Amino acid sequence: MTGNETRDREPAWVNLLNFMIHQEMEGRVSIQLDFLPNFGLIFSVRVLEELKTTIEVLKGQESQRLRTFCTSNCMEPRRDLDSFGRFLMIGTLDELVVDYAARMDIKTKAGMEPGGAIKAVANDLYSLRWGPIDTPIFNLLGLFMQIIPDFRCKYISLADFLINAKVPVDGRDLSGSTALSHCYSTKPGFDLEYAELLYKAGGEVNNRNRYGTTTAHEIAQVYNRSDPSSVQKATKALEWFLSHGGNADIADGDGISPRSICAAIKYMVPQLLAVIEKEDTRRALRGNTCCSLCGRAPSADEKLLMCGRCKKGRYCNPKLRACQKLDWPKHKKECKAL
């Protein structure tokens, strides 16, 4: 019996599955396999274009395929920048001020009150995206700092102006990463001054991207573990992350946390796990006076909210931070035990 005759006698679903696996290997689709009682093995297929439009945390092959796309494609100034993006790249603050005034003038002439016009212009600027991975405005400025480091101070001034103009700093690119996530991940950005600026403007250090990872996941994956400068940079970045409310136990879509990565490489890079354990001790000493997830103590006019079920977990106000939501996958095991 020939190979073709054998394939002809195979069930249709086997031929279809083989075809779809071949398509996935070529990067055209993503296959999700599941086993359902009474139905057996089923699979669902999502093409890359569909993955781009979804918002949920991805895992497995879907996560890897979107990651591959985002790391293989980037914003190229000559190809992707419009006129506004090009003058941002030049870094002239005076021109940005003039552009902003013109946008405000359009809104007020349309009948908006000053407060409404400020919000509308801020939303317009927040909504802007460039390139194949939908780079937002603060991410764009961070990228410019990598491309033209001599203009870095100019880009910081532009970012500061936009922050004062009430433009939110939490815009996400196609990977779900914010400007804050990019600028201290160490791959390739490491700019703690820009990170501090974005953090004070409301940036969330525990932001999870489309793969479910926080910046700490990237920091923990030190590419060159034998290079002292790489290890030192990663250690400093992790210290900044934790000291600004970062949590090392938030798991990605496949259940892996920064703590588990640091524990796995502790014999090669012991500094990272040591940083986490030092922060564990600091937060433990604070006891019930700090948030269970981020370790922040509330300000004088705020108070921590307790888990309604176990009364043990304490969290920041959900209107300010999503600490309880982020901690739930870990806390629910302890909560049920209680």
For each feature predicted by the language model, list its residue ranges:
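Tandem repeat protein-protein interaction scaffolds
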Residues: 144-155, 164-165, 185-193, 200-203
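Ankyrin-repeat intra-repeat helix-capping/turn positions
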Residues: 91, 154, 187-190, 223, ...
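Ankyrin-repeat-protein effector appendages
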Residues: 229-338
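Ankyrin repeat domain, specifically the short helix-to-loop turn at the C-terminus of the second helix
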Residues: 98-119, 157-169, 194-205, 236-247
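Conserved ankyrin/ankyrin-like repeat signature
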Residues: 95, 154-158, 190-194, 237, ...
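N-terminal segments that cap or nucleate solenoid repeat domains
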Residues: 3-140
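Ankyrin-repeat boundary/"N-cap" motif
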Residues: 76-85, 113-147, 171-186, 208-225, ...
